[in-house]
């Protein structure tokens, strides 16, 4: 088998593994745990592959913590007709999701806004 064909063959074997690794949240987040975090939205990035939310949270002993969070794709948000304006920078929200295995992070699957609107984002 010529070298080019071998390289292409090996490359085709690797693509599914890389794809699965990217979409498996279990590598970065712990799907066996669910926590809730309440705070103020400091940044939003509405883009694929995952919508990103940053929050400032008052933790234990009144210490301010910055959290980085992800949720489903922008494509899913559109499909589910979730308007990006349902939360904005400066809003106080409560979120539930799977905590990061390292650091202050969360994979969000539920958002409760300050005015009582609850939005489910396809979680467990």
Q: What are the language-model segments listed below?
A:
Residues 71-79:
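Short, structured beta-strand/loop micro-motifs enriched in basic residues and often containing a Trp
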Residues 21-35:
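Short boundary/loop segments of OB/S1/cold-shock single-stranded nucleic-acid-binding domains
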Residues 100-123:
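OB-fold/S1-family single-stranded nucleic acid-binding modules
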Residues 39-41:
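Conserved hydrophobic positions within beta-strands
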Residues 47-58:
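Short aromatic-glycine-enriched beta-strand elements
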Residues 1-9:
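Bacterial N-terminal signal peptides that target proteins for export
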Residues 79-95:
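Short nucleic-acid-contacting surface segments enriched for D/E, G, S/T with interspersed K/R
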């Amino acid at each position: 088998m010529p070298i080019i064909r071998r390289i292409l063959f090996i490359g085709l074997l690797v693509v599914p593994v890389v794809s699965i690794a990217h979409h498996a949240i279990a590598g970065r987040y712990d799907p066996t745990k669910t926590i809730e975090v309440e705070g103020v939205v400091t940044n939003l990035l509405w883009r694929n592959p995952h919508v990103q939310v940053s929050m400032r949270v008052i933790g234990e002993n009144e210490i301010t913590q910055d959290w980085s969070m992800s949720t489903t794709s922008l494509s899913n948000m559109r499909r589910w007709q979730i308007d990006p304006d349902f939360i904005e920078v400066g809003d106080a929200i409560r979120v539930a999701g799977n905590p990061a295995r390292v650091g202050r992070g969360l994979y969000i699957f539920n958002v409760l806004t300050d005015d009582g609107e609850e939005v489910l984002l396809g979680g467990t």
